[in-house]
A protein has these predicted regions:
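Terminal, non-catalytic protein-protein interaction segments that mediate quaternary/complex assembly
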Residues: 1-263
Protein backbone atom coordinates (compact mmCIF):
# COMPACT_ATOMS: atom_id res chain seq x y z
CA UNK A 1 0.00 0.00 0.00
CA UNK A 2 1.39 3.36 -1.04
CA UNK A 3 1.81 5.62 1.99
CA UNK A 4 0.81 9.27 1.74
CA UNK A 5 3.79 11.56 2.10
CA UNK A 6 2.53 14.39 4.24
CA UNK A 7 4.03 17.89 3.82
CA UNK A 8 6.99 18.76 6.07
CA UNK A 9 5.10 21.72 7.54
CA UNK A 10 1.60 23.20 7.41
CA UNK A 11 0.43 26.73 8.22
CA UNK A 12 -3.15 27.83 8.92
CA UNK A 13 -4.12 31.42 9.78
CA UNK A 14 -7.73 32.49 10.29
CA UNK A 15 -9.54 35.37 11.96
CA UNK A 16 -11.54 33.25 14.42
CA UNK A 17 -11.42 29.79 15.91
CA UNK A 18 -14.17 28.13 13.85
CA UNK A 19 -12.61 28.50 10.38
CA UNK A 20 -9.20 27.71 11.87
CA UNK A 21 -10.52 24.45 13.32
CA UNK A 22 -12.31 23.41 10.14
CA UNK A 23 -9.28 24.22 8.01
CA UNK A 24 -6.85 22.22 10.10
CA UNK A 25 -9.24 19.26 10.35
CA UNK A 26 -9.56 19.26 6.56
CA UNK A 27 -5.79 19.35 6.12
CA UNK A 28 -5.13 16.52 8.57
CA UNK A 29 -7.80 14.29 7.04
CA UNK A 30 -6.79 14.97 3.43
CA UNK A 31 -3.01 15.27 3.73
CA UNK A 32 -2.13 13.38 6.89
CA UNK A 33 -0.08 10.19 6.82
CA UNK A 34 -1.43 7.15 8.66
CA UNK A 35 0.72 6.57 11.73
CA UNK A 36 0.33 4.09 14.59
CA UNK A 37 1.30 5.87 17.80
CA UNK A 38 3.26 4.32 20.67
CA UNK A 39 0.05 3.05 22.27
CA UNK A 40 -1.01 1.32 19.07
CA UNK A 41 -3.66 3.86 18.05
CA UNK A 42 -4.03 4.48 14.32
CA UNK A 43 -3.95 8.19 13.47
CA UNK A 44 -3.78 10.54 10.54
CA UNK A 45 -0.90 12.88 11.26
CA UNK A 46 0.63 16.09 9.98
CA UNK A 47 3.94 17.23 11.41
CA UNK A 48 4.97 20.78 12.29
CA UNK A 49 1.54 22.38 12.07
CA UNK A 50 1.21 26.08 12.93
CA UNK A 51 -2.28 27.47 13.49
CA UNK A 52 -2.88 31.16 14.25
CA UNK A 53 -6.20 32.58 15.46
CA UNK A 54 -6.27 36.36 15.13
CA UNK A 55 -9.27 36.99 17.42
CA UNK A 56 -9.33 34.00 19.79
CA UNK A 57 -11.77 35.70 22.17
CA UNK A 58 -14.55 35.16 19.60
CA UNK A 59 -15.77 31.66 20.50
CA UNK A 60 -17.88 30.89 17.41
CA UNK A 61 -17.95 27.11 17.78
CA UNK A 62 -21.46 27.03 19.26
CA UNK A 63 -22.99 27.25 15.77
CA UNK A 64 -21.23 24.19 14.36
CA UNK A 65 -23.67 21.78 12.70
CA UNK A 66 -23.23 18.38 14.35
CA UNK A 67 -26.17 16.48 12.87
CA UNK A 68 -25.91 12.75 13.62
CA UNK A 69 -22.23 12.80 14.54
CA UNK A 70 -21.57 10.02 17.06
CA UNK A 71 -18.83 11.68 19.13
CA UNK A 72 -18.96 15.35 19.97
CA UNK A 73 -15.74 16.62 21.56
CA UNK A 74 -16.00 17.79 25.16
CA UNK A 75 -15.16 21.34 24.10
CA UNK A 76 -18.59 21.46 22.43
CA UNK A 77 -20.10 21.50 25.94
CA UNK A 78 -19.81 25.00 27.43
CA UNK A 79 -20.29 23.69 30.97
CA UNK A 80 -17.34 21.35 30.51
CA UNK A 81 -15.27 24.20 29.11
CA UNK A 82 -16.00 26.42 32.09
CA UNK A 83 -14.50 23.74 34.34
CA UNK A 84 -11.65 22.96 31.93
CA UNK A 85 -10.57 26.59 31.68
CA UNK A 86 -10.04 26.64 35.46
CA UNK A 87 -6.90 24.58 34.76
CA UNK A 88 -5.22 27.80 33.69
CA UNK A 89 -5.26 29.16 37.24
CA UNK A 90 -4.79 25.90 39.15
CA UNK A 91 -1.88 25.53 41.59
CA UNK A 92 -2.44 21.88 42.58
CA UNK A 93 -2.92 18.73 40.53
CA UNK A 94 -5.81 17.32 42.59
CA UNK A 95 -4.85 13.75 41.75
CA UNK A 96 -4.26 14.30 38.03
CA UNK A 97 -0.89 13.34 36.49
CA UNK A 98 -0.47 16.93 35.32
CA UNK A 99 -2.46 20.18 35.21
CA UNK A 100 -1.27 22.93 32.88
CA UNK A 101 -1.84 25.77 35.31
CA UNK A 102 -0.07 23.89 38.07
CA UNK A 103 2.93 23.04 35.89
CA UNK A 104 3.26 26.74 35.03
CA UNK A 105 2.44 28.20 38.45
CA UNK A 106 4.11 25.65 40.73
CA UNK A 107 6.98 24.41 38.57
CA UNK A 108 9.58 22.53 40.65
CA UNK A 109 13.19 23.57 40.32
CA UNK A 110 16.19 21.26 40.55
CA UNK A 111 19.17 21.99 42.78
CA UNK A 112 22.57 20.44 42.02
CA UNK A 113 23.86 18.74 45.18
CA UNK A 114 27.01 17.00 43.93
CA UNK A 115 28.25 13.94 42.09
CA UNK A 116 27.42 10.33 42.82
CA UNK A 117 30.01 7.57 43.16
CA UNK A 118 29.77 6.85 39.43
CA UNK A 119 30.38 10.55 38.68
CA UNK A 120 26.76 11.14 37.68
CA UNK A 121 25.36 14.50 38.73
CA UNK A 122 22.83 14.42 41.57
CA UNK A 123 19.91 16.85 41.84
CA UNK A 124 17.15 17.34 44.34
CA UNK A 125 13.92 19.29 44.06
CA UNK A 126 14.10 22.90 45.06
CA UNK A 127 11.26 25.37 45.58
CA UNK A 128 8.32 25.65 43.18
CA UNK A 129 8.36 28.62 40.81
CA UNK A 130 5.26 30.49 39.65
CA UNK A 131 6.45 31.15 36.11
CA UNK A 132 3.52 33.48 35.43
CA UNK A 133 3.67 35.79 38.47
CA UNK A 134 7.37 35.48 39.29
CA UNK A 135 8.84 35.64 35.82
CA UNK A 136 6.63 36.29 32.77
CA UNK A 137 4.67 39.21 34.22
CA UNK A 138 7.70 40.97 35.80
CA UNK A 139 9.65 40.44 32.58
CA UNK A 140 6.93 42.14 30.54
CA UNK A 141 6.66 44.97 33.06
CA UNK A 142 10.42 45.45 32.85
CA UNK A 143 10.41 45.57 29.05
CA UNK A 144 7.38 45.00 26.82
CA UNK A 145 9.61 44.08 23.89
CA UNK A 146 11.21 41.14 25.67
CA UNK A 147 11.49 37.84 23.82
CA UNK A 148 12.27 36.00 27.06
CA UNK A 149 8.76 35.73 28.51
CA UNK A 150 8.51 31.95 28.26
CA UNK A 151 7.06 29.28 30.52
CA UNK A 152 7.32 25.50 30.58
CA UNK A 153 5.00 22.71 31.69
CA UNK A 154 7.54 19.94 31.02
CA UNK A 155 9.19 19.16 34.35
CA UNK A 156 12.35 17.30 33.31
CA UNK A 157 12.78 15.47 36.62
CA UNK A 158 9.34 13.91 36.32
CA UNK A 159 8.37 13.76 32.67
CA UNK A 160 11.76 12.96 31.09
CA UNK A 161 11.49 9.53 32.66
CA UNK A 162 11.05 6.37 30.62
CA UNK A 163 8.53 5.15 33.20
CA UNK A 164 6.30 8.22 32.87
CA UNK A 165 2.95 7.23 31.33
CA UNK A 166 1.04 10.54 31.28
CA UNK A 167 2.92 13.68 30.23
CA UNK A 168 1.85 17.18 29.11
CA UNK A 169 0.95 17.78 25.48
CA UNK A 170 1.30 21.57 25.75
CA UNK A 171 4.93 21.98 26.77
CA UNK A 172 5.87 25.64 26.39
CA UNK A 173 4.34 29.08 25.97
CA UNK A 174 5.98 32.26 24.72
CA UNK A 175 4.42 35.66 25.32
CA UNK A 176 5.17 38.63 23.05
CA UNK A 177 3.73 42.14 23.40
CA UNK A 178 3.60 43.82 20.01
CA UNK A 179 1.43 46.54 18.41
CA UNK A 180 -1.16 45.74 15.77
CA UNK A 181 -1.67 47.74 12.57
CA UNK A 182 -3.60 50.43 14.44
CA UNK A 183 -0.84 50.83 17.02
CA UNK A 184 -2.77 49.09 19.82
CA UNK A 185 -0.47 47.02 22.00
CA UNK A 186 -1.52 43.38 22.05
CA UNK A 187 -0.30 40.39 24.02
CA UNK A 188 0.30 37.41 21.73
CA UNK A 189 0.86 33.86 22.96
CA UNK A 190 2.41 30.93 21.13
CA UNK A 191 1.91 27.46 22.58
CA UNK A 192 4.24 24.61 21.57
CA UNK A 193 2.69 21.15 21.73
CA UNK A 194 4.54 17.89 21.25
CA UNK A 195 1.25 16.10 20.55
CA UNK A 196 -2.08 17.64 19.54
CA UNK A 197 -5.33 15.79 18.85
CA UNK A 198 -6.99 18.26 16.53
CA UNK A 199 -10.59 17.00 16.60
CA UNK A 200 -11.06 16.38 20.31
CA UNK A 201 -8.52 18.69 21.97
CA UNK A 202 -7.17 21.60 19.88
CA UNK A 203 -10.08 23.99 20.50
CA UNK A 204 -9.89 23.32 24.24
CA UNK A 205 -6.15 24.06 24.15
CA UNK A 206 -6.83 27.44 22.52
CA UNK A 207 -9.46 28.26 25.15
CA UNK A 208 -7.03 27.43 27.95
CA UNK A 209 -4.28 29.55 26.38
CA UNK A 210 -6.79 32.41 26.10
CA UNK A 211 -7.38 32.16 29.86
CA UNK A 212 -3.62 32.46 30.41
CA UNK A 213 -3.49 35.40 28.01
CA UNK A 214 -6.21 37.31 29.86
CA UNK A 215 -4.68 36.51 33.26
CA UNK A 216 -1.24 37.75 32.22
CA UNK A 217 -2.70 40.98 30.83
CA UNK A 218 -4.59 41.57 34.07
CA UNK A 219 -1.50 40.94 36.19
CA UNK A 220 0.65 43.26 34.07
CA UNK A 221 -1.92 46.06 34.40
CA UNK A 222 -2.18 45.47 38.17
CA UNK A 223 1.57 45.59 38.78
CA UNK A 224 2.55 48.70 40.80
CA UNK A 225 4.85 50.85 38.75
CA UNK A 226 3.71 49.55 35.35
CA UNK A 227 3.87 52.56 33.08
CA UNK A 228 3.36 50.90 29.73
CA UNK A 229 0.31 51.19 27.49
CA UNK A 230 -2.87 49.16 28.08
CA UNK A 231 -2.66 45.70 26.54
CA UNK A 232 -5.33 43.91 24.57
CA UNK A 233 -5.61 40.23 23.70
CA UNK A 234 -3.67 39.37 20.58
CA UNK A 235 -3.01 36.33 18.44
CA UNK A 236 -2.97 32.81 19.78
CA UNK A 237 -0.73 30.47 17.81
CA UNK A 238 -0.26 26.76 18.34
CA UNK A 239 2.77 24.93 16.97
CA UNK A 240 2.14 21.18 17.00
CA UNK A 241 4.96 18.72 16.41
CA UNK A 242 2.38 16.00 15.79
CA UNK A 243 -1.08 17.23 14.79
CA UNK A 244 -3.28 14.18 14.46
CA UNK A 245 -6.79 12.74 14.49
CA UNK A 246 -7.49 9.28 15.88
CA UNK A 247 -9.01 6.72 13.52
CA UNK A 248 -12.12 6.47 15.71
CA UNK A 249 -12.79 10.16 14.94
CA UNK A 250 -12.04 10.23 11.20
CA UNK A 251 -15.66 9.66 10.19
CA UNK A 252 -17.09 12.19 12.65
CA UNK A 253 -14.52 14.84 11.68
CA UNK A 254 -15.38 14.22 8.02
CA UNK A 255 -19.11 14.54 8.71
CA UNK A 256 -18.51 17.82 10.56
CA UNK A 257 -16.68 19.20 7.54
CA UNK A 258 -19.52 18.12 5.23
CA UNK A 259 -22.12 19.63 7.57
CA UNK A 260 -20.20 22.92 7.42
CA UNK A 261 -19.98 22.85 3.62
CA UNK A 262 -16.35 21.72 3.40
CA UNK A 263 -16.89 18.10 2.41
Amino acid sequence: MLQIQSPPATVVSRTTIQPALLSVLNKVLSLGAEVDDERGNRTKELRNVTVTVEKPWIWNLDNLVWGKIMFRPKWADREFMKAYELQASATTRNGHPYVYGTELRAHPTLAYVGDDKDDSRVFQRGHAVDQISEYIVPKLVENLRTRRAVGFTWNVAEFSDLKATEVPCLDMIQVLARPDKSGTERLHITGVLRSNEMYSAWAADVALILELQEDIIGKVHATPGYRGPPLGCGLITTVSGSAHIYEENWEDAGHLLMNMGMG
